Each structure stands twice: as structure tokens, then as C-alpha cells.
């Protein structure tokens, strides 16, 4: 077994340590990252990295993360353990022998809702119950702040409180404007919230394929992605060993895990879309729900009459799930089983509190196809399905495009809010131009920052490998850092309270030539320091009042220091001169005093 355990990345980020903030309503400890800053109080920031960056924790992925939520669920008294379904050869793509990834060593009986009970965060919120998950998420959002901070921005309809309370979280979930993806079988989860009245979140995609990657790589990709700030992770595996790899990932994931169950269902029928059936798909939903998947992408909005609308597109149907279901619909000349059986899907989602991520199977795959009738028709259907899911106490977010030029992005957000009743929007980018293969993390981050400002709640990252290949570890980091930047830019534009604290702290460090603080306060300390040290590697250079860009004579900030010092010197001299003038008026020369006395 030891040979199969991946070497994962652990340890704090430079200049940082893990701290925990206690709850007041529930017995919880919420993790955050504290960054040490010279000559200033430390800066506390949101932290999704889990125990892997805690110096006091020895990670053992063969045991998985601690059971954080089990007691919460049992105290509620509305769940019941049961034996669960048996794992079949089809679950792992019929892999066998040396090709079969070992099963995760620990197995618990799965939980599901007790008869007649609703165990979703939406059901609790509607009943006025503030769960530990809700308080946990609320505390995270405040990033250690106890008081309001000055804010500057245009919220674009968002209602951002100075401080997020557990009651505010409950109310937003009850209204359908936010979700806490938290399958009752993902007991290791550190709960988080997705909604436009909270910090903009990001998702990282990982997953093996039929031609590359392994369990070792995928677990490390997950840990690596959350180290750099991924708030959720989607496992989009399409090759063999899907079940076992997913188990290893979930048991070691402190963040919500999402999937597209259709991919595994397709593997179970040999990759032939026409052979898919409701029975195979339903079995796959239950399988993944028992494992603890927190949200499912369900492409139920692809309807038969919409498919011809894509015929004249430049790039047709680019969603894998969308194309699979379109092919099935055309072959069987009927609506998809995802649409026809949506009520039954809701029953499964409700029993385990799996959140819906209603998929945009007809999203535009090129800017030429942006905002066309196929895209809009599907969006309207997703709005109808949202109401059906809400009626069954299921949490819902809506997936969005895709490829959209900048001038059409705002309309996407407005249409989503209108047709989907303010359910959280979750977008892939969007990519704002199609001319940059190898740089689509940049083309998409432009659109992501914009749509995040306009109201998107979560951004799905794009890596440099988009359209080119399966991302590796380095691509994952590049994608996550790029999207953390886009999400933070959106928070600043919206006027999120406290968002600018980190910018201001780094700006002060930059002006004062505190190089180590600059590195540590950045999104990627390692890369920042490596770039600095390429040309100024000596320790003495960490104290230098210049960098290699300008050198000592042309550094604008050094010159600004000189200007400030000179201005202060002149201001001081002016103050002294004023004092002398005041003194001259109080103490007249002797001759004048005698003359005045004689008069």
C-alpha cells in the first residue's frame, strides 16, 4: 500500500501560520491563514488549504482527514446509516489486476436522510435553523475581522454586509441566493458558501483521462490546487479507476468536490452515448452520493427542440455533457432522461444534500456563438428546473459560459439573474477572445473578473492547457493563481468589505522596500521571490531600496522617499519660521518698548 501513496505537498506558505477562530453558536474552530507583516499587525486571510498547511498536523492520506461533521449530523438526528451499494467492476471502468487502483483503506457505512426528513442546508435555512455549517461559513467570510472596514466599489446589485453573520448566511440560503455544498457523507468537509453577496469563489478542475494521469497525480493536484486557493474542486475523470480515485480524493478533501456523473455513466456503457439509460445514470448518482460528492453537474437543460439551434454555430456544442445528451436525444427522438426524470434526481439530491450545478450544455464555444438563441433557450429551462429543485429543498447553482466578448458579458449576468431567480451563477471564464491557445487562462481571466464584478458567485478556472491537453501540476497552479487574481479584482470592484486590506498592506511594504513582506503578502510568494532573486539573489538585496528593473538611481519609490523627506524638511522649516514670526509679535525690540512706555 505504501507504494501507492502519493507524496503530497504540505507545510505553511512563506511567512504564514494556521490559526483557528472559535464559533459562538456551535463548538467549531474555523481555520484561517495569518500572514506575518513587519512593523504591522499580522494580516488574516481566507484559507481553503485544509490541514495540509498546518505545521502542527502530520498528514496521512491513507487515513484521510478527520471526521469534522459527523457529530453535527448525528446530533441533528435526521440521518440514518445503511450498508450502501456494492462497488462493481463497471464503477472502475472494468480495470483489474495491476491496472486497478487500490480502494481507499477506510470504509464507513454511508448516511442518507431518515424517512420523511429533509437534510439539506436549504431545508434547515427555511426552517429558521442556523446549522454549524452556516456559522462556519459566516466566520470564514469575515477573515478574522471584528469591525467594519472602509470600502470602495460599485456592488452592481449585490448586498454586502459589513460583517457576515450566521443569520445572514441562513437568510441567503433560504432565499436561494447562496448554497453550502455539503453532502452528508463528506464528513471531512470544511463548509464554505457560494453566493454573490459573499466573496467570489473559484473552482479548479482535475481528473484523469483514458490516456493519462493516475490516482497519485490527482490527489496531489487536489492538495496543490487548494494550497493556492481553490475553493472547490471538480473531479472530471473519464478513464478507468474513476470510483477508487474519487474515493481517495474525497476522503482527503477539505473543500467541496463536484463531478459530472454523466461521464462515469458513459464509461459504464462502453462510451456509447446512445446506450445510456436512466437506470445506469441513477445508479451512478447514488454511487457518487454515497461517496460524498458535494455537487453534481446535471445537463438537464438540453432539450430536443433546442439542438437544431446549434446547427449554424461556428463551434456547435462544445460541452462534453451537452454533446452526449444531444446525441442521445437525437438517436432516441425524445427528451433526455435527465429532463424527464428530474423529479427523481431531486429525490436523490435531497436525500444526501448534494447540490445541483445545472449544466450549460449549450454554452458558446466561440465568441461568434455568444448569447445566441440556443444558449438563451437553455438558460430559461434551467430557471424552470431551479424552481422544481427548490420546491424539493435542493440547493441549486447555475453554470454559465463559455466564450463571450467583453461587451456581451453584462447581458449574460442580467439574463441569468432574471431567468434563474438569483440562484448563484458559476461560470467558466468567460473567454473574451479565441486567438490565444496556450494563454486562455489570461483570455478567460479578463472575462472572469468582469462577470465576477457583475454578480457571478463562483468562477471555474481555465489553465494554459485549455483546448490543448490535460493540465499537469504546474498548469493547475497557474490556473488557480490567475483565477484568485480575477476573483479578488471582482471583490474589489464590488466593494467587498475588507477586500482592500491585503492590497494596502502590500502597497505599504512595496513603498517601504520590505521585500519579504511583499513576497509573503502576494498570491504566489514562491514565484515572486524567485523572480526577484534571479537578478538580486543575495540576502543583502532583501534590504535594498531598489530592484533590478530601475536600479538605485532610477527607482521611483526611492526618489519618492527623497521627495517626501525634502517636503517634510521644508514643512518643518516653514513651521519654525512661523513660530519665529509669532515670537517677533510677542516680544518687541527694546527701543520700541521704551518708546511705547513713554507715550
From Swiss-Prot:
The cofactor note reads: Binds 1 [4Fe-4S] cluster per subunit. The cluster is coordinated with 3 cysteines and an exchangeable S-adenosyl-L-methionine.
Which protein family is named in the record?
Answer: Belongs to the ThiC family.
Q: What is this protein called?
A: Phosphomethylpyrimidine synthase
Q: What does it do?
A: Catalyzes the synthesis of the hydroxymethylpyrimidine phosphate (HMP-P) moiety of thiamine from aminoimidazole ribotide (AIR) in a radical S-adenosyl-L-methionine (SAM)-dependent reaction.
Q: Is this entry keyworded Iron?
A: yes
Q: Which GO terms describe its biological process?
A: thiamine biosynthetic process; thiamine diphosphate biosynthetic process
Q: In which pathway does it act?
A: Cofactor biosynthesis; thiamine diphosphate biosynthesis
Which is a Gene Ontology cellular component entry for this protein?
cytosol
Q: How does it assemble?
A: Homodimer.
Q: Which cofactors are reported in the record for this sequence?
A: [4Fe-4S] cluster
Organism, by scientific name, is Paracoccus denitrificans (strain Pd 1222)
Q: Name one GO molecular function term.
A: zinc ion binding
- Binding of substrate occurs at 205, 234, 263, 299, 319-321, 360-363, 399, 426
Which Gene3D superfamilies does the UniProt entry name for this protein?
Answer: 6.10.250.620, Radical SAM ThiC family, central domain
> Which amino acids does the record list as binding Zn(2+)?
403, 467
Amino acid at each position: 500500500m505504501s507504494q501507492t501513496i502519493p507524496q503530497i505537498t504540505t507545510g505553511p506558505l512563506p511567512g504564514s501560520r494556521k490559526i483557528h477562530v472559535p464559533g459562538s453558536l456551535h463548538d467549531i474552530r474555523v481555520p484561517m491563514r495569518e500572514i506575518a507583516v513587519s512593523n504591522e499587525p499580522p494580516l488574516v486571510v481566507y484559507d481553503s488549504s485544509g490541514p495540509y498547511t498546518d505545521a502542527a498536523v502530520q498528514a496521512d492520506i491513507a487515513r484521510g482527514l478527520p471526521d469534522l461533521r459527523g457529530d453535527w449530523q448525528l446530533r441533528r438526528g435526521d440521518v440514518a446509516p445503511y450498508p450502501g451499494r456494492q462497488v462493481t467492476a463497471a464503477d472502475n471502468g472494468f480495470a483489474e489486476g495491476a491496472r486497478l487502483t487500490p480502494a481507499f483503506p477506510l470504509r464507513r457505512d454511508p448516511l442518507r436522510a431518515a424517512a420523511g426528513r429533509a437534510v439539506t442546508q436549504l431545508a434547515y435555512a427555511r426552517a429558521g435553523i442556523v446549522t454549524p455549517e452556516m456559522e462556519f461559513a459566516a466566520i470564514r467570510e469575515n477573515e478574522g475581522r471584528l469591525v467594519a472596514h472602509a470600502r470602495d466599489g460599485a456592488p452592481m446589485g449585490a448586498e454586502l454586509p459589513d460583517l457576515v453573520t450566521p443569520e445572514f448566511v441562513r437568510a441567503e440560503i433560504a432565499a436561494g441566493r447562496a448554497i453550502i455544498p455539503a453532502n452528508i457523507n463528506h464528513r471531512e468537509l470544511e463548509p464554505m458558501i457560494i453566493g454573490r453577496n459573499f466573496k467570489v469563489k473559484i473552482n479548479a478542475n482535475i481528473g484523469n483521462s483514458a490516456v493519462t494521469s493516475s490516482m497519485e497525480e490527482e490527489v496531489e493536484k487536489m492538495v496543490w490546487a487548494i494550497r493556492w486557493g481553490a475553493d472547490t474542486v471538480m473531479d472530471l475523470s473519464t478513464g478507468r479507476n474513476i470510483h477508487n480515485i474519487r474515493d481517495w480524493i474525497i476522503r482527503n478533501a477539505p473543500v467541496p468536490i463536484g463531478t459530472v456523473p454523466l461521464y462515469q455513466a458513459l464509461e459504464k456503457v462502453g462510451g456509447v452515448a446512445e446506450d445510456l439509460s436512466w437506470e445506469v445514470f441513477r445508479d451512478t448518482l447514488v454511487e457518487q452520493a454515497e461517496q460524498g460528492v458535494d455537487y453534481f453537474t446535471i445537463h438537464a437543460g438540453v432539450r430536443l427542440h433546442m439542438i437544431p439551434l446549434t446547427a449554424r454555430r461556428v463551434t456547435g456544442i462544445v460541452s462534453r455533457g451537452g454533446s452526449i445528451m444531444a446525441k442521445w436525444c437525437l438517436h432516441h427522438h425524445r427528451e433526455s432522461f435527465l429532463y424527464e426524470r428530474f423529479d427523481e434526481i431531486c429525490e436523490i439530491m435531497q436525500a444526501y444534500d448534494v447540490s445541483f450545478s445545472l449544466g450549460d450544455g449549450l454554452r458558446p464555444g466561440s465568441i461568434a456563438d455568444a448569447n445566441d438563441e440556443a444558449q438563451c433557450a437553455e438558460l430559461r429551462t434551467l430557471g424552470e428546473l431551479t424552481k422544481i429543485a427548490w420546491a424539493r429543498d435542493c440547493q441549486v447553482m447555475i453554470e454559465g459560459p463559455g466564450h463571450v466578448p467583453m461587451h456581451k458579458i453584462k447581458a449574460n449576468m442580467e439574463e441569468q439573474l432574471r431567468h434563474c431567480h438569483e440562484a448563484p451563477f458559476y461560470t467558466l471564464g468567460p473567454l473574451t477572445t479565441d486567438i490565444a491557445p496556450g494563454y486562455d487562462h489570461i483570455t478567460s481571466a479578463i472575462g472572469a473578473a468582469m462577470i465576477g464584478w457583475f454578480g457571478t458567485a463562483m468562477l471555474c478556472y481555465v489553465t494554459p492547457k485549455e483546448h490543448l491537453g490535460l493540465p499537469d501540476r504546474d498548469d493547475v497552479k497557474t490556473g488557480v493563481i490567475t483565477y484568485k487574481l480575477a476573483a479578488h479584482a471582482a471583490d474589489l470592484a464590488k466593494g467587498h468589505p475588507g477586500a482592500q486590506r491585503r492590497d494596502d498592506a502590500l502597497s505599504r511594504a512595496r513603498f517601504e522596500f520590505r521585500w519579504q513582506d511583499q513576497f509573503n503578502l502576494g498570491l504566489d510568494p514562491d514565484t515572486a521571490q524567485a523572480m526577484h532573486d534571479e537578478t538580486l539573489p543575495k540576502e543583502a538585496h532583501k534590504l535594498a531600496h531598489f530592484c533590478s528593473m530601475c536600479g538605485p538611481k532610477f527607482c521611483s519609490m526611492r526618489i519618492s522617499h527623497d521627495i517626501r523627506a525634502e517636503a517634510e524638511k521644508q514643512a518643518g522649516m516653514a513651521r519654525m519660521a512661523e513660530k519665529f514670526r509669532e515670537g517677533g509679535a510677542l516680544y518687541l525690540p527694546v527701543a520700541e518698548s521704551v518708546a511705547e512706555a513713554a507715550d
